[in-house]
């Protein structure tokens, strides 16, 4: 059963991301952000393609201001990759599907 994208907030971030057995992709976004709206469907697609290999999650920075601040998110969209509770890498700005998939595959090696 496809779990889909996990929706994060300040309360569930630690459990869902830092406590995850799988590597995590976290998309920091906001509804009012045009580039974020373009990245959203791409994030949904890679969630399906990497099911069981990655946990894919989204954090609306308006609902998760504390978490966004903790991780120094200053511009959105920002995509961060976590593994074993640690930030492995991050990217700021809109990404295409092929670029995002390549980054995910690289982190699985």
Short names for language-model regions:
Residues 1-55, 62-109:
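Proteins that catalyze or organize thiol-disulfide redox chemistry
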